Amino acid sequence: MMMTTIDRVAQNARVTVLPPAPEPSTSDEINHRVANSLQLLSAMVSAEARGIQDPVAAAAFDMTLRRIGAIAGVHRQLYRSHQGAMVNLGTYLDELGGELEESVADTAAGRFVIVHAAGVLVRAEEATSIGIIVSEIVTNAFKHAYAPGASGIVSIALRATARGGYLLEVKDCGQGRDPDQAARGTGLGGRLVGMMATKLGGHHAWLHANPGTCFELCVGKR
């Protein structure tokens, strides 16, 4: 029987059969829906905030949006990773840093968020606490660490420690602030940072960075 050109091509071709994509589990589907719901909530809050004239109230709405975004990011990571209830903090902080750079930094003025984060796996609720801490500190740093119109960087660093835990550092190179005053955190944001750090069961401190200020959180083996 004569072989056609198509037959020869089909006979000689190497066909790579890709494994089917994993079916989303019930928890994946829940995380996907939660992330979508939080995105909808964020859009509603954003629409409401556009009509506010009072700068203090507007700032409170903006911070609320960032807190919602930090929580939604955890659920997006859970849905994408198919790792059950565990979140890769490195991937999560990379994404969160980009979102914070877009929302609170000013790249045109030379203000950036730099992230160097190791791929530490943590539980979802732990990642949520870390996200809220980072969002609060980065936002506050761009508000107060640098003079209006001045360039500046806020860095987020995460590394695994020898004892099976991790060390988180959020640092600016700005005007600096009294670590004792920062630790007291009389505003809602400062209180949230303290509450979340305590919830994680680690040791946290505000340090002089010379120049600037550094927040450090060390969490032991989980």
Question: Across the structure, where does each feature detected by a protein language model lie?
Answer:
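Conserved short strand/loop->alpha-helix "switch" segment adjacent to the catalytic nucleotide/phosphoryl-transfer site
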Residues: A13-N31, A85-V87, V104-S135, F142-I153
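Short beta-strand/loop element within the Bergerat-fold HATPase_c
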Residues: S151-G164
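Conserved DHp (HisKA) dimerization/phosphotransfer helix of two-component histidine kinases, i.e.
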Residues: L40-M44, A57-G110
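Glycine-rich nucleotide-binding loop
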Residues: G165, G176, A209-E216
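Acidic ATP/Mg2+-coordinating residue in the GHKL
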Residues: D172
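Conserved phosphoacceptor histidine of two-component systems
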Residues: P24-Q39, A43, A47
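C-terminal beta-strand of the catalytic ATP-binding
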Residues: L217-R222
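ATP phosphate-binding glycine-rich loop and adjacent ATP-lid/helix-beta elements
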Residues: P179-L207
